[in-house]
């Protein structure tokens, strides 16, 4: 962003309408292309590549785009002309692709400047471990044990394009840029009936910006409702000795409390409400009653239907009781498990037993969903029986082995925090046997003959880092294997979901 600020120096009078003129500057396209290419190289595993834009970028195309933007009628191609000359559609789609890249970079400028100004004078703490997805689970293990219900919400996408434009309208005060954005977006999406649209996709950075702006608007309204919905906790009711005119006493007590003890007013807000958003979904965990959870469900449905004009079915908001239902969260099936614990207490000559119940977060592996993903990618059938990977038989033995080892270790590292490892061992078994069958098929041999010729050392590559470390810590005994089966290890180097974990 510092590179852009070197080219963009604005006075106070032009800050409200400085975006639109940037579309007609050639150096902005160069900076946008260079910035986007560097971001793709740094985050190649997270963002998609826009190969068409990278290959077809040139200064000549930029000059043609600028000339056409001076006369927007030249960017409009009737459908009859598309049937006669499909090349016109390909050319204009390429123009809209480059404009989308530029629009994403330009509109991010005021957001970045506003964000940078808010951090001035503040010293931010860097916690690299919190960047991992697995940093969420230790937090939930500490918090979810105090909750009763979880609201599982599937965030809907806006159906009409005008919803996206109106959302940006609250953030961007440049009317000309919004009108141009609306024009390009509608022209691009009007060609849904033509095959040329399937070969071109908008820039992922642009789509990510639209999605985040849409979610930001939704969450700002939700947080406003969250602050307005604070209510008195049940532990504060002990100060009232009588139940006559109960709510009147609450109001009078609050007036006295605010006047005399303003610093302790936070005690009367309900802190047991946590919101987590992930992968197009969000969960709202709370200690409320079923009546209040139904109210929150009603709020979500009406918020999307009335404010965002999106048809949102009530079935997309599920109320899960953690003690009975499983919560699908980040590839795990999470629930609360009651562990009875008996403690013997000795007091002088008398001894007695105390029954305690510990509530613990139980994270299970969705074995059926993962087997379905493996079957979809031809690693096994729908019943979980391993089959050979026919499309990999043209590769070398080392490449085949490295592919299977990499997939096996990724899954093992991600699901290493599960409460029971039985399903994880089953997945590893499927991948190991699939690897052996693939190599045996390549060498035109049977599995038994192939293993007899190479020995069991071939499968030692599948040992994960967890197995290697724990085998050095614990001695080889029945008790050690049982402890290894129960232990949880969260790997903090996992920053995103891989394809097999993302099985929805």
Swiss-Prot record:
Q: In which compartments does the protein localize?
A: Plastid, Chloroplast
What is any one of the record's Gene Ontology cellular component terms?
chloroplast
Q: Which InterPro entries match?
A: Domain_X, Maturase_MatK, Maturase_MatK_N
One Pfam family per UniProt: MatK_N
Query: Would I find Plastid among this entry's keywords?
Result: yes
Q: What are the protein's UniProt keywords?
A: Chloroplast, mRNA processing, Plastid, RNA-binding, tRNA processing
What positions belong to coiled-coil segments? none
One annotated GO biological process:
RNA splicing
Query: What's a single GO MF annotation on this record?
Result: RNA binding
Question: PANTHER family annotated for this entry?
Answer: MATURASE K
Task performed by this protein = Usually encoded in the trnK tRNA gene intron. Probably assists in splicing its own and other chloroplast group II introns.
Q: Which family does this protein fall into?
A: Belongs to the intron maturase 2 family. MatK subfamily.
Question: What is the name attached to this protein's record?
Answer: Maturase K
Native species? Arabis hirsuta
From which lineage does this chain's organism come?
A: Eukaryota, Viridiplantae, Streptophyta, Embryophyta, Tracheophyta
């Amino acid at each position: 962003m510092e590179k852009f600020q070197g080219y963009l120096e604005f006075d106070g009078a032009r800050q409200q309408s400085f975006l639109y003129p940037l579309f007609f500057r050639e150096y902005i396209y160069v900076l946008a292309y260079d910035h986007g290419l560097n971001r793709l190289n740094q985050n190649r595993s997270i963002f998609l590549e826009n190969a068409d834009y990278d290959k077809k970028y040139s200064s000549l195309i930029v000059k043609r785009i600028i000339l056409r933007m001076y006369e927007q009628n030249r960017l409009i191609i009737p459908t009859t002309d598309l049937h006669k000359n499909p090349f016109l559609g390909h050319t204009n789609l390429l123009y809209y692709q480059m404009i989308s890249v530029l629009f994403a970079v330009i509109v991010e400028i005021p957001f970045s400047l506003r964000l940078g100004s808010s951090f001035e004078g503040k010293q931010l703490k860097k916690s690299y471990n919190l960047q991992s997805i697995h940093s969420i689970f230790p937090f939930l293990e500490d918090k979810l044990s105090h909750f009763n219900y979880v609201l599982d919400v599937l965030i809907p996408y806006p159906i009409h394009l005008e919803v996206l434009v109106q959302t940006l309208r609250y953030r961007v005060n440049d009317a000309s840029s919004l009108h141009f954005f609306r024009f390009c977006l509608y022209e691009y999406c009007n060609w849904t009936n033509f095959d040329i649209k399937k070969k071109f996709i908008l820039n992922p950075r642009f789509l990510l910006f639209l999605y985040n702006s849409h979610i930001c608007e939704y969450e700002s309204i939700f947080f406003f409702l969250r602050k307005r919905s604070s209510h008195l906790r049940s532990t504060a009711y002990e100060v009232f000795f009588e139940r006559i005119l109960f709510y009147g006493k609450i109001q009078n007590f609050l007036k006295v409390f605010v006047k005399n003890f303003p610093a302790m007013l936070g005690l009367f807000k309900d802190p047991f409400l946590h919101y987590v958003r992930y992968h197009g979904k969000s969960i709202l965990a709370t200690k409320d009653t079923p009546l209040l959870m139904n109210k929150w469900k009603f709020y979500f449905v009406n918020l999307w239907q009335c404010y965002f004009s999106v048809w949102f079915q009530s079935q997309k908001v599920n109320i899960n009781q953690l003690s009975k239902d499983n919560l699908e969260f980040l590839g795990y099936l999470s629930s609360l498990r009651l562990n009875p614990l008996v403690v013997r207490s000795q007091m002088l000559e008398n001894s007695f037993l105390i029954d305690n119940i510990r509530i613990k977060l139980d994270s299970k592996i969705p074995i059926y969903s993962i087997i379905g993903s493996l079957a979809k990618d031809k690693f096994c059938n729908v019943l979980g029986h391993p089959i050979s990977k026919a499309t990999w038989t043209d590769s070398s033995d080392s490449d085949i082995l490295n592919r299977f080892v990499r997939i096996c270790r990724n899954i093992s590292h991600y699901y290493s925090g599960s409460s029971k490892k039985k399903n994880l061992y089953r997945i590893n078994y499927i991948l190991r046997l699939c690897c052996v069958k693939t190599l045996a098929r390549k060498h035109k041999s049977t599995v038994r003959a192939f293993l007899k010729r190479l020995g069991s050392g071939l499968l030692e590559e599948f040992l994960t880092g967890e197995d290697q470390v724990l085998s050095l810590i614990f001695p080889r005994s029945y008790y050690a294997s049982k402890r290894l089966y129960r232990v949880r290890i969260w790997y903090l180097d996992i920053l995103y979901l891989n394809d097999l974990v993302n099985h929805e």
